[in-house]
């Protein structure tokens, strides 16, 4: 973002220079460049050292460099127009206004980026809190499940013991009934024997 801001500052200065040159061309006089890039100044020094004897050649080189620089600026401005929201009034969409809008747009994007970072940090913190709560709940449910399984096992044991007791009681009742039947049969046989003796 800082590099973009520096580029915007350079473009602002270039736009002011271009507008000043256009105004001066309308009035018929020229001005001096407010700043020079290192590459352009080095090239101009080399061209001056080579062509002291031919001022026409240096002038054509200067024009070519100026044309190249303007084409580069135009290309950058066209790219900037595609990324910066502009006003509907086309008369106000000058190069200077475009660069100022770009600067405001960059500040707005930086603020949105900061807000997004804060929101992301807050959501991460909430996610960690929810995970710890979920782990606690899962641990509690596992304990409850183990307790319920233990109670089910103990209830099954008590049911089986109750069935054993009932079976023992039934066997005791059965043996008692069998004993009673055996004794009654014995009594009947005895009475028959006594009656036989009486008849005899």
From Swiss-Prot:
Residues 57-109 form the bHLH domain. Keywords: DNA-binding, Nucleus, Repressor, Transcription, Transcription regulation. InterPro entries: bHLH_dom, HLH_DNA-bd_sf. GO terms for cellular component: nucleus. GO terms for molecular function: DNA-binding transcription factor activity, RNA polymerase II-specific; protein dimerization activity; RNA polymerase II cis-regulatory region sequence-specific DNA binding. SUPFAM superfamilies: HLH, helix-loop-helix DNA-binding domain. This is Max dimerization protein 3. Pfam families: HLH. It is found in: Nucleus. Residues 40-69, 136-165 are annotated as: Disordered. GO terms for biological process: regulation of transcription by RNA polymerase II. Efficient DNA binding requires dimerization with another bHLH protein. Binds DNA as a heterodimer with MAX.
């Amino acid at each position: 973002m800082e590099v973009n801001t520096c580029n915007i500052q350079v473009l602002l200065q270039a736009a002011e220079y271009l507008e000043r040159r256009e105004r001066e061309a309308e009035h018929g006089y020229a001005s001096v460049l407010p700043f020079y890039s290192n590459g352009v100044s080095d090239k101009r020094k080399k061209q001056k050292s080579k062509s002291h004897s031919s001022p026409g050649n240096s002038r054509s080189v200067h024009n070519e460099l100026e044309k190249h620089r303007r084409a580069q600026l135009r290309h950058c401005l066209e790219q900037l127009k595609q990324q910066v929201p502009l006003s509907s009034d086309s008369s106000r969409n000058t190069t200077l206004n475009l660069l100022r809008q770009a600067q405001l747009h960059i500040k707005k994007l930086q603020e949105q980026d900061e807000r997004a970072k804060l929101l992301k940090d807050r959501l991460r913190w909430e996610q960690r809190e929810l995970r710890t709560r979920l782990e606690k709940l899962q641990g509690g449910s596992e304990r409850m499940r183990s307790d319920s399984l233990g109670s089910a096992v103990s209830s099954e044991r008590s049911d089986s013991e109750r069935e054993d007791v009932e079976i023992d009681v039934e066997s005791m009742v059965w043996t008692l009934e069998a004993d009673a039947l055996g004794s009654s049969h014995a009594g009947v046989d005895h009475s028959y024997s006594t009656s036989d003796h009486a008849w005899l």
